[in-house]
Design a protein with these regions (language model features):
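Solvent-exposed, charged/polar functional surfaces in cytosolic regulatory/catalytic domains
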Residues: 1-6, 39, 82, 86, ...
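N-terminal helix-turn-helix DNA-binding core of bacterial DNA-binding proteins
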Residues: 2-43
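Charged, amphipathic alpha-helical coiled-coil/dimerization segments
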Residues: 51-111
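C-terminal regulatory/oligomerization modules of transcriptional regulators
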Residues: 104-125
Length: 125
């Protein structure tokens, strides 16, 4: 799609971008792979593949989870943080692919998604 095309110069797909953004927003810049899957609502295999590619590109590193010896953390690197900033600027310029919608359509989508996120506990009203 349009977003993947915009992200291609950064070596990213939208799924990889989402994972990097999630890591960049986390307090420590690192999250367990399991939690990444839960937050992005994707299968563990997809998380593994995404982190593999981001790690290969030098945008994240894997580390043992000090809270769970069986688990692994993905941690964003300085290069990963730089790519998030640059890619976000490009996506913002393209209005995240939402240019074709009228204001009333955007408001309806925002309202619906806000309700879903409040119910999911992402934030309070």
């Amino acid at each position: 799609g349009e977003l993947d095309t915009l992200l291609r110069p950064f070596g990213l797909t939208f799924a990889r971008y989402e994972a990097l953004v999630l890591l960049s927003f986390s307090r420590a810049g690192a999250l367990p792979l399991r939690l990444i899957g839960e937050r992005l609502m994707v299968h563990p295999t997809s998380v593994t593949n995404t982190i593999d590619r981001l790690e290969h590109a030098g945008l994240v590193v894997r580390k043992p989870n000090p809270q769970d010896r069986r688990g692994t953390l993905a941690e964003i690197t300085p290069a990963g943080r730089a790519v998030v900033v640059q890619a976000t600027e490009v996506l913002m310029t393209a209005e995240f692919g939402l240019r074709g919608y009228q204001d009333d359509q955007l408001c309806a989508m925002f309202s619906l998604l806000r309700t879903l996120r409040v119910e999911a506990g992402d934030f309070t009203e």
